[in-house]
Swiss-Prot record:
Domain spans labelled RRM: 6-84
GO biological process assignments: miRNA processing; positive regulation of mRNA splicing, via spliceosome; positive regulation of translation; regulation of translation; response to cold; translation
Name of the protein in question: RNA-binding protein 3
Pfam family, any one: RRM_1
Positions carrying Phosphotyrosine: 153
Source taxonomy: Eukaryota, Metazoa, Chordata, Craniata, Vertebrata
Residue numbers of Dimethylated arginine PTMs: 105
């Protein structure tokens, strides 16, 4: 449990900042047990955030006070306890896939209502020439393609 207490979220990283640069920058505050820069699974490029675990939780608190809002590799970084807001944000954004998708789909249907087919560019709509199902599958915001819309941006 003490390693979790000493774990910090570091956000707003320069995409070229790697684990070694993070460790070099933060090691003056105390011994570090782990440094991770989170990378995209497919491209292996940095996602702009990471985690640093200090062996002593007091060192982590010192780092948070001293480094939050400071500049690292030309970017202003955010430093916070990993268990506090970083995990809460991640849980809200990634932990409830079904709820997030439902909200997107519901929001699209409510926002456009049944008239959404009438306002599309390209001369389609009003029920002429294209079936409702075909238009729906091309929209990207309705319930039939909500998963596809999200999946395209998940990559």
């Amino acid at each position: 449990m003490s390693s979790e207490e000493g774990k910090l979220f570091v956000g707003g990283l320069n995409f070229n900042t790697d684990e070694q640069a993070l460790e070099d920058h933060f090691s003056s505050f105390g011994p570090i047990s782990e440094v991770v820069v989170v990378k995209d699974r497919e491209t292996q490029r940095s996602r702009g955030f990471g985690f640093i675990t200090f062996t002593n939780p007091e060192h982590a608190s010192d780092v948070m006070r001293a480094m939050n809002g400071e500049s690292l590799d030309g970017r202003q970084i955010r430093v916070d306890h990993a268990g506090k807001s970083a995990r809460g944000t991640r849980g809200g954004a990634f932990g409830a896939h079904g709820r997030g998708r439902s909200y997107s789909r519901g929001g699209g249907d409510q926002g456009y209502g049944s008239g959404r087919y009438d306002s599309r560019p390209g001369g389609y709509g009003y029920g002429y020439g294209r079936s409702r199902d075909y238009s729906g599958s091309q929209g990207g915001y309705d319930r039939y393609s909500g998963g596809n819309y999200r999946d395209n941006y998940d990559n």
